[in-house]
Every structure is written in C-alpha cells, then in structure tokens.
UniProtKB/Swiss-Prot annotation:
Single GO cellular component term: nucleus
One Pfam match: DUF5595
Name the record gives this protein: Kinetochore protein NDC80 homolog
GO biological process, one term: mitotic spindle organization
Length: 640
C-alpha cells in the first residue's frame, strides 16, 4: 500500500494528489488533479492573478508576454554542494588532478600528492595565482585582504558555492582543505575551457540535420524548432500544444521515413517478448528453491573436489614410495651387473689359462665330463634360482597389495573417525580414548593385534551409549512429528480463514471502486452542465441585453442548486468512503493479525524442527554402527 500525503492512514487507492509545490521540467497541463471526494469546480480567475509556477519563474495568465526571458532562476536560495567532499577517495582524486596540472604546466616547484595533503596558506596563494594567470595573465597576489579577494574572484567566475573568509586562514585544515581543493579543480576546469575557446577549432558549430554528435546523440533541428515554438506559446499563456505535436509527428515521420506497416510486426514482437517474460516468471515461481538446490550442489561438488584432492595426495605419496622402491631395485641391479662382469672376467682368465695348458686325452675327457656335469648343475641351479626369484616377486606383489590395502583401510578408518568425531582423543565422542592407529606395517604383525584389542573395548562402550541415544531420539522424533502434523492442520484451517477474509476485502474494494467511478461520472456530467450554462449565459449577454438581469438571477439560482447538490453528494461520498475505509481497515488489521500469528507459529515450528534436526543422529549413528561392525570384522580377521 502507498501512504497518502494528506493523512497518516494507509490509503487503499493510488496517490491521486500530487505535490503542487514541486517544480518539474515538464510543461504544466491545464487540468488540476484533485483528490477523491473533492468535486472539481471551475473557479473564475482574474486577469492579473497568478495561475501556475513554472521552472523559469512566474507566468501571468492574461496572455501577455513576460518582461524577462528567463525569470528568477533559482532566486537567492543557497545551493547545496552535491560533491562528496567527505569521501577520501574523491579528495585524493582531486589532489591528483591538481598535482598533475601543476607539474604538466611548469609550476615552479615539483609537487607530489603527499605534499598537497595539507599545504600552508602561502603555498595555496602561489598555487591559486599560478592557475588564475591562465585566465588573467596580469594577476598578482594581493598584499593584504586576500581572504576577501579570492572568494570574490571565485564568485565573479561563477563558482556556484560560497567560500568563507575563515577558510582562507586555515587552508590546510582537514575540515577546510576538501572545499578548497574542490574549488581549485573547478578553476582548472575553467582554465581548460578557456584554452579550448581560444583555439581556432569551431567547437560550437551548429551540427546539420541528422548529424551524430560526439556522445552518440542524433541532433535534430526539428525538435529544436518544436521546443522553441512550444516555449514561446507557453510564455504567452498557453498550456496545450496539440497542433504542434501533430505537426511534429508528421515531420518526424517524413524525416526518418517511418513505415507504419511495420508497427504491427513490432507489436507482435512486443507481445512475444511479454509472453516470454511471463513464461520465465512462471518458471521462477515453479522453481522457488532453485538457488538453494544449486547451492547444495555446489557444496556437494566442493566436497567431491576435496575428496579428489585427498585422493591425489595419497596417490602422490604412493608414487613416491614406488619411486623409492624402484631406486632400491635399480641399485641392486647395478650391483648384480657388477658381480656378473667380475664373474665373466674371471671366466675369461680361467679359459685363457685352460687354453695355455697341455692336457692328455684322458684329462681332456675327464674335464669335458666334469664340465658337462657342472653345466647341468649350473642349469639346474639357474632354473631353481629363476623359480625362486619368480616366487619371491609374486610374494612381494602380494605383500605390496596387502600393505596398500591395509594402508587404504587405515586412512579410511582415520577419515571416518574424524568425520564421526572419534579422532583425535580430544574429539567430541572420543571420551578420551585414542582411536588413531599408527603402526609400521614392515614390523611384526603383533602391532595390529595390539591396536585391535585397544580399540574394540572403547568401541563397544560407545556403541552401547549410541544405542541408548538412538532410542531416545526415536521417541523424541515421533513426538515432534505428531506436533508438526497438528500444527500443519491448524495452519491449513487458518489459511482457509485468511482466504475468506481476503475474498470479502476484494468484494469491498470492488464496491468502493464502483462508487468512485459513479462519483467521477457525476462529476463529469455536472462539469458538462456547467459548461453548457456558461455558453448559454454568454449567448444571452451578446444577444439580449434586456434579459441579462433575469438570466443572471437564473444562473445564480442554478449555481446555488448545483452547489447544494454537490455539497450533498460530497457529504454522501465522504460518509461512504469513511465507512468503506473503516471496514477495509478492520479487515486488513484482522488479516495482518492472523498472518502475524501464523508467521510466529511457523517460525516457532521451524526453530523446533531445526533444533530437532540438529539433534537427529539416527541415520548417522546407524551408518557409524555399520562401519564399526565392518571395521571390527576386518580387525577380527586373521592377519596375513
């Protein structure tokens, strides 16, 4: 609802009485807007009375032209400075502009932004004199009363804001320097404008018809002519310009080659876009929690990203471990190659000795026989060695897989323990027990048995406590569900009551609107009757002078009767309006009280439900119990 400007109550209709004292840039219209219940009556205006106040000053209603072209624009009212002088960023920007201008134009001293944070009065006078010499080259600082001279110069240049004398004594003060530096920046803008005006470029050359200016706006001489003609008529006392508007529309259509056949296509496109907007709004209404669901999806994806990052970290650590193993195997391989080379050299040496010796045939046969036996023995041993190596490699693979599986299970156990707040010992549900397993898998297997015996007893104790908590939470949940069901039933009943009250309020609103329309029709009818009577009076004055007195008496009588009827109608409408307003206010207050009560109930139920959901650990405890049982089975299984 909108609040009326006449009374402090909430109006049921849009605001009809506008602020008559606020000046606007639009052309004033001839009709006076009046509030509801006030029948418009034409009041006779004297030839010298003031009718309206325009943006440019007072305008007489007798049709005579104004003596002044522009009027009292703004008067002597003090203009409020719209610049953010209390904003540090704005002041620093002004200081930078001042520093850049002085340094670029050859100021006698090299200035920095820091040195201009709070200059002295002497430095300010030098800076002002340097800038002002661009406008007045013969200017010199006054020897005395500079506090009066400088504000006077700014005023003569047209600076719209006043500079006090006291500010000239404390130029560098924190409360004064922002106003001074803003004035200096304005003076710099004046200097730049003067430099542009002194140049030979035709800056203010009038653009041609249809030409585009620098800021992208099309210049239109037709609109300028239309504005001049309308303003001339406005200053002569006219308030409507229908003939100029029609002529302007025709000229614009001819100038821009408007094809009226395309209007229907544009209207269809507009309707299509409106339907698209309605469809999107319906989709938005059908999916009110889409943002919440997307946020939940975002949180879930972030959790998945964190899991993948943890997995990558584990993979990197495992890769580092494999690299260490590869390096150790490479070292063993190099050592074995060195031994093989030494054995080959020894064989070559022995073979050389064998070739140089002289043996008998029996010795050669015996040596060949022994050589064959040794070769068979070597082949058998080599085969056994290969089998042992293959078996050792398979055992190492099994051990590595088993170790990796155990490490994965340990990391998963630690992750679940942190998730359910059992790790570290200071966690919420740890009860001082240390459930973290820190064992060396390369050592004896008795450490796993030790940790299994260490963890089983506290876990059994925590499981027994959890079962009791689950039973209590289940009972509490059932009670809360019953309460929520009762509250939902109550809310449904209250919603039905609110719907009935809203229907009644809608009917009253329709009745009220009907009464308003009837009153407006009566008002229009009375206005037409008054206009016809006025025309009849004018005809009687021009045609028949003898019956003037009788016509005036009849007119006065008719006006009295009309005023009486208007007064009676106004009183009746006021009474009807008051009754309707009281009824609608009562209904609105009742609806507001019911909505407030329902909102309080809803908030209370939501708070209780949120508190219950925070305490609802049934699902988490069941998952925890299943995981504990699974881990217990793993720990109870015999180690490899």
């Amino acid at each position: 609802m909108r609040r009326s400007s006449v009374t402090n109550r909430q109006s049921l209709l849009p605001l009809r009485v506008q602020d008559a004292n606020r000046m606007g840039l639009t052309t004033p219209q001839s009709k006076d807007r009046q509030g509801f219940g006030k029948l418009s009556m034409s009041k006779p205006h004297s030839g010298t009375s003031e009718r309206k106040t325009s943006f440019f000053g007072k305008r007489m209603s007798n049709g005579t032209a104004r003596t002044s072209q522009y009027g009292a624009f703004g008067g002597t009212e003090k203009i409020k400075d719209p610049r953010p002088l209390h904003d540090k960023a704005f002041i620093q920007q002004c200081i930078r502009q001042l520093c850049e201008f002085l340094n670029e134009n050859g100021y006698s001293q090299t200035l920095t932004v820091k040195s201009l944070q709070g200059p002295s009065t002497k430095d300010f006078l030098k800076i002002f004199a340097f800038i002002y010499t661009f406008i007045c080259p013969n200017y010199e600082n006054p020897e005395s009363k500079f506090e009066e001279e400088i504000p006077r110069i700014f005023k003569e240049l047209g600076y719209p804001f006043a500079l006090s004398k006291s500010s000239m004594y404390t130029v560098g003060a924190p409360h004064t320097w922002p106003q001074i530096v803003a004035a200096l920046v304005w003076l710099i803008d004046c200097v730049k404008l003067c430099c542009v005006l002194r140049s030979e470029n035709p800056v203010f050359e009038e653009p041609q018809m249809g030409e585009q200016s620098e800021n992208g706006i099309d210049f239109n001489q037709l609109f300028l002519d239309y504005t001049v003609r309308c303003y001339d008529q406005f200053m002569e006392g006219r308030d409507t310009f229908e003939e100029y508007d029609a002529d302007m529309c025709i000229r614009l259509k001819e100038a821009y080659h408007v094809d009226e056949s395309n209007l229907e296509a544009l209207q269809q496109e507009s309707r299509r876009l409106l339907e698209e907007i309605e469809r999107l709004e319906k989709e938005k209404e059908n999916e009110p929690d889409r943002l919440a669901s997307m946020r939940k999806l975002k949180v879930s994806l972030q959790a998945d990203i964190q899991k993948y990052q943890n997995y990558l970290t584990e993979i990197e650590s495992h890769s580092t471990l494999l690299e260490q193993r590869v390096s150790s195997v490479s070292e063993d391989l190099e050592a074995t190659e060195l031994e093989s080379r030494a054995v080959q050299q020894e064989n070559l040496r022995l073979k050389n000795i064998l070739d140089n010796q002289k043996y008998s045939v029996a010795d050669i046969e015996r040596i060949k026989y022994e050589e064959n036996e040794l070769q068979q023995t070597i082949a058998k041993l080599t085969k056994d060695l290969d089998e042992d190596k293959q078996q050792l490699w398979s055992e190492e693979l099994k051990y590595a897989k088993m170790k990796e599986s155990v490490e994965t299970q340990l990391s998963e156990f630690h992750k679940i323990g942190r998730k359910v707040r059992l790790i570290p010992p200071t966690a919420e549900y740890a009860n001082g027990y240390d459930f973290q397993i820190q064992c060396n898998l390369d050592s004896e297997q008795s450490s796993l048995i030790h940790y299994r015996n260490k963890i089983n007893v506290p876990l059994v104790e925590i499981l027994s406590q959890s079962e009791g908590q689950i039973a209590g939470a289940t009972n509490k949940k059932m009670g809360v569900e019953d309460m929520v069901e009762q509250l939902n039933t109550l809310i449904g009943e209250k919603k039905n009551e609110v719907k009935v009250q809203k229907d009644e309020a809608q009917k009253l609103e329709e009745t009220y609107q009907q009464k308003v329309e009837e009153a407006e029709e009566d008002e229009k009818r009375w206005i037409s009757e008054i206009e016809s009577l006025e025309k009849h009076r004018q005809l009687l004055e021009s045609g028949v002078n003898k019956s003037l007195d009788e016509a005036l008496k009849d007119l006065q009588k008719e006006q009295q009767e009309l005023q009486l009827v208007e007064h009676q109608t106004e009183e009746e409408m006021r009474q009807v309006e008051n009754k309707l307003v009281r009824v609608v206010h009562a209904v609105a207050n009742h609806v507001a009280v019911i909505e407030k009560h329902l909102e309080e109930k809803r908030l209370k139920v939501e708070r209780e439900y949120e508190e219950f959901m925070k305490e609802d650990l049934l699902l988490d405890l069941r998952e925890l119990l299943d995981k504990y049982k699974e881990k217990a089975r793993v720990l109870d299984s015999p180690p490899y």
